[in-house]
Amino acid sequence: MAKFEIKKIINRLVENLSDRSRDVILSRFGIGKDDYETLEAIGQRYGITRERVRQIEADALRHIKNPANEPVIRPVVNALNEFVKSRGGVMEESALKADFAVNHFEVKPEPSKKYEGAAMFFLHLAGNFIRTKEDDNFWPRWALDAASLKNQEGLVNYLIGQFKKEKKAVSLDEFMGWAKKYNPAPNPDAVSASLASAKNVAKNSFNEWGLISWAEISPRGVRDKAYLVMKRLQKPLHFTEVAAEINKAAFSPRVALPQTVHNELIK
C-alpha cells in the first residue's frame, strides 16, 4: 500500500502561491491543523469578504491544477480512486478522509488526523468524484459515479427493510447474511462503507446492528441500558451488578449509579 510523504507533496503544490493564497488553501482544508477554517473566519483575519476568500481559494486551486503539477497530483488521486473503488465506489466523507489519511499518508510524528484535510484537498483536485450532501438518510458522501451511489442506496434500503421485518438487532455475521441475499457475493468493505454512510443504521455497545431509533441500539436512559445488559447476560442480577455491567458496556461517558438503577428497576 503506497504511503505518501504528504507534507512534502503539499509544500510542493503550494510553494508558488502567494503567502495569502497558501494560507487560505491550508486553512480552508485544515491541512496540518486541528480543523478547517470557515470562509468567514479567514475573511475576518484578512479584513476581506467571504466571497473574496472564495475567489482566492478558487484561483489557488486553478493554479495548483496546472499541468506541470500533474506528476505530483496524479499518484495521490489514483490511490484515492482505488481506495474508494475497493469500498464499493462510494464512502461517507469523514470515514473516507480519516481512513485514507491513516492508510496512505506518512506524517509521523504528527497524528494523521491533522492531514485528513489533505484527502479532501485531493478529492477536489481529482475532479472525477461526485459529492452528495447530507440528507435524511445519508451522511455526506463521495462517489466515483452515479451507479455506485445507486448500488449503495439499494443495499441500505434493503437492509433497513430487513430490520423492519425482523424487528431485532443482529450480529455482523447475520447482517452479512442479509447482504448476501441482496448480492450473492458482497464486498465486506463495501457493506461496511454502506453502514458508515447510512444515518438510520448503527451498532450498539455489544456490536449488534439495528435501526438507530431502536432502544436496543440507542438506549436513552438507565432503564433501556439495564434491559440490554440483562438481556445479554440472561441471568438474575443484583441492581449493583446491573450498574456495574452498564458502566462496563460504556454506553455513554455518564456513570450509572447503583441507586439510580435501583430506582428505575422498581418503577
Regions from the PLM with identified roles:
Residues 1-267:
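C-terminal non-catalytic scaffold/interaction domains in large multidomain proteins
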